[in-house]
Amino acid sequence: MTRAVKPRRFAIRPIIYASVLSAGVLLCAFSAHADERDQLKSIQADIAAKERAVRQKQQQRASLLAQLKKQEEAISEATRKLRETQNTLNQLNKQIDEMNASIAKLEQQKAAQERSLAAQLDAAFRQGEHTGIQLILSGEESQRGQRLQAYFGYLNQARQETIAQLKQTREEVAMQRAELEEKQSEQQTLLYEQRAQQAKLTQALNERKKTLAGLESSIQQGQQQLSELRANESRLRNSIARAEAAAKARAEREAREAQAVRDRQKEATRKGTTYKPTESEKSLMSRTGGLGAPRGQAFWPVRGPTLHRYGEQLQGELRWKGMVIGASEGTEVKAIADGRVILADWLQGYGLVVVVEHGKGDMSLYGYNQSALVSVGSQVRAGQPIALVGSSGGQGRPSLYFEIRRQGQAVNPQPWLGR
């Protein structure tokens, strides 16, 4: 009996050991899963915090972009007024130069009249001496002398009246010159004020750009910038499409009118005669005839180094749809051909943009401008200044972004440029 009981007691120990070991393994497993869950929660919390930070920075960036737009629009307006003031000042200087020349001429005339008057007075005096002798010698000669004296008296009176008139003219010119100089002083004061205002705005803009650059470095550069570039391009296309739609009726009407002129020319040729279009009709046909085949016939919008070419890699799979030309800030941007302005506005990524329609689905686009010199609906001629080079849209240096679009699609603009 005793031998039978002992083995049963010894058999329980391995079971207990196995149970304890199994429980330990399970506890370790539960502990590991708990650690993983905690780690996952921590990672998720970090991700959520980073997402909130990114959203906050994006909101700050959007706010700064809005401020950047206002600053650049204000600089554009200040630059335009500065240019107008300078033009007015140049005109006043020209008027003052003309008045000075007129005064000098009048002074010369006055001196000549005074010399002539002195000669006449001397002649009259000499005639008076001869008249005394003639009174003794002959009564008839005496009468002749009296007539000569009367003649010289009238002549002297006329000379005195001329001198008085010249003096009056000189006083009037002096008054006008004083008035012009006063206006010039006012213009100079306004010019100084505007320059100070522009300097203040430029400083504020530079500060905004620095803040914007700091935010950009804290946001993911790759996909974020790629998405933004796509959005900028989409906004540009939409803005152009809206501008085209708004100008469509006028463009179609002008195209019909231009075709009517061409039909009249053809009809005249068929009849063996000629039809000479008016200047207005010539301008109409020129600005609605499109850019034609690229043969280097168009004006360069601005002269300078090409910083980016059409088709170069921009970001990821995105390519430049136009070209970027470096130039000094304030350089005149010229229309490449005749046309009509359909867009002059600030667009994110492109700054202040001017778009000119040339007819037959062709248009040219000018971006990054400091100031626009034309407005929507303006007719422009080839080589006419339409904007001033700038760095709007947050660009790092003054330059011009230039595109040519044909039937809504961006094409390589380089082959058209040559003049």
UniProtKB/Swiss-Prot annotation:
Domain of life of the organism encoding this protein: Bacteria
A GO term for molecular function: metalloendopeptidase activity
CDD domains: M23_peptidase
Known outcome of mutating Y366H: Partially unstable, loss of AmiA and AmiB activation
Subcellular location as annotated: Periplasm
Effect of V353A: Loss of AmiA and AmiB activation; does not complement double envC-nlpD disruption, protein localizes normally
InterPro entries xrefs: Cell_wall_metabolism_enzyme, Dup_hybrid_motif, Peptidase_M23
Region (Disordered): 252-290
UniProt keyword annotations, A-Z: Cell cycle, Cell division, Coiled coil, Periplasm, Signal
Record note on what altering K321A does: Retains AmiA and AmiB activation
Disruption phenotype: Mutants show defects in septation and separation, and form very long filaments (1.5-fold increase). The phenotype is exacerbated when combined with nlpD (over 8-fold longer), more exacerbated with a triple mepM (yebA) or ygeR disruption (15-fold longer) and further yet by the quadruple disruption mutant (envC-nlpD-mepM(yebA)-ygeR, over 21-fold longer). Quadruple mutants are less sensitive to ampicillin lysis.
Coiled coil stretches, renumbered: 35-124, 155-271
Parts of the chain that traverse the membrane: none
Function of the protein: Activator of the cell wall hydrolases AmiA and AmiB. Required for septal murein cleavage and daughter cell separation during cell division. In vitro, exhibits weak endoproteolytic activity on beta-casein.
UniProt cross-references to NCBIfam families, sorted A to Z: PRK11637.1
UniProt comment concerning the protein's domains: The coiled-coil domain is necessary and sufficient for recruitment to the divisome. The LytM domain is required for proper septal peptidoglycan splitting.
Family: Belongs to the peptidase M23B family.
Name of the protein: Murein hydrolase activator EnvC
Native source species: Escherichia coli (strain K12)
